[in-house]
Amino acid sequence: FESRRLAKAALSFFDSSLLPGKAVLCRLLLARIAQRTNDLATAHKESSAAIEKLTDMQAPMLKHQAFLLMGQIHSTSGNRKEAYDCFRTSRQALEMLRSNLRGQELKMAFLKNRLEVYELLVDACLGGQYSSESLAEAFGYIEEAKSRTLMDQMLQPVYSAGEDSGQSDLVRRMRNLRDELNWYYSLIELEQLRPEQRSPDHIKRLEEQVRARETDLIRVLQESNVSGESVSGMQSGKSLSLEEIRAALTRETLVVEYFQTGDRILACLLGADQLQIVPVTLASRIANVLRLLQFQLSKFRLGTEYAAAFRDSLIESTKAHLKTLYDELLAPLRDRLDAPHLLFVPHGALHYVPFHALFDGERFVIDEHTVSYAPSASIYAVCTKKQVNTDGPALLMGVPDQNAPSILEELEALKAILPDPQMFVGKSASEYILKNAGPGARLIHIATHGFFRQDSPMFSSIRMGSSYLSLYDLYQLRLPVELVTLSGCATGLNVVAAGDELIGLARGLFQAGAQSLLLSLWDVHDQSTADFMTEFYRRLQSGEDKAQAMRAAMLAVREAYPHPYQWAPFVLMGKYAK
């Protein structure tokens, strides 16, 4: 009641002032208070007054908020048609706002807590009888809510900061900060590799220095406008239409795209001549199972002796969690998964699910289908149309150490398989080589340690010969290649930000121009990874497409290494077919 009194007092003041936007906000606050106390008549009255006042104002954010609230009031009152119309108007205002933003960090921050209107529109489209038109419209809203900023960046030219950019001071500051960060990263890694001499206090001090410089680097990148933003002045692109996406699919492909509305998870099944949207489970049921699976996979960090001693129980426990995930996410779709190739488009926490390794009690998904992944169906379609090198060398790079001695064996095996290989090992596997040889390569394979930063995903990195290559560094590379493989630990992990934006190495590689990626979802086993990569590239050279080669490599490695931790860490993203 106190909040209502204060809102009315503020409204009385702003109604007589030259700040009509503030008066609208007061009306919306009064409407929200009434809605939450179930006084729908007052809520409708205040929202209507706010919308009427907006008629003569250019205030798209207020328009978005007002029509979203009015739609929710209509929905609660059972007025589905009126609610739907309000949600559409709210979305249009939001899209107009987003299209005029510059800088991908700003766009992603803008979407935080503003995706509700897309969820409500999906629910509104599916609230009545499912028609082909309502299904297509719902699918369009689902695509609009996924990885839009990444697609914007993929559609715009790559910009690399150079001395001729007119920003030489900023460029020098960036380089100095990157050099300092690489030095501190190396010191931290050296400390961690010496457990008997490790000083937690010293590591903590080094990490404080790292965080300070990372903050400075983010600030400089934002100033210089090279953190992934085009200098062409292009506005935000839209998600592709249903028919544009369909045109990119082969008849053997079924897109399985998930979307969460509230606690409910929906699955969209899109093929060359079908579109279905099926409720499958609740997000709250998935979260705990996924944590248990990740806990099981983390047990391999306890060492090879532990893994060998408890081999059978580790396998059975992991398969049990994979079976539960199958029952929740795929069993409701079992009779509809009739395509040879499944293209999974996850949402939210489902980006951490290894769908290819889900288990029905007898067989894994990869036993029945080839599998690939994409951040959105629109991004998959964009990947199929990318202009990339169809010939050129295979660029092989690796940084072996005592924790990954099989990296050299892996590279030597690939050198014998791939045509026109260029191999760089150790210190010679540098960022300079990648920057200069990468643009002309057809394939790039980097075997090294990956570092996923949950606390600051923009600084997730891979170790190069004398530096660490982060997401920000990838933003400034041009890599128009058919395939980039990172065969290190957790190179495919991302933080899922607002708008289902993936913040990790995959983002930087797609933006740099790669058509497809082969990355890992968790820490990888050294020898099984070498065996997997050898079989994958051998199959690729024999004429199989990337998805077929990945499936064959997984099945071959599983014969010797039956635990999913060892045979199932890798995911193929982007274009999979020839």
Positions of predicted regions on the chain:
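Structural signature of tandem alpha-helical TPR/SEL1-like repeats
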Residues: 2-5, 42-45
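Catalytic cores of enzymes
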Residues: 5, 228-578
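Alpha-solenoid helical repeat architecture
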Residues: 1-2, 14-29, 56-66
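Amphipathic alpha-helical protein-protein interaction segments
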Residues: 44, 48, 64, 80-363, ...
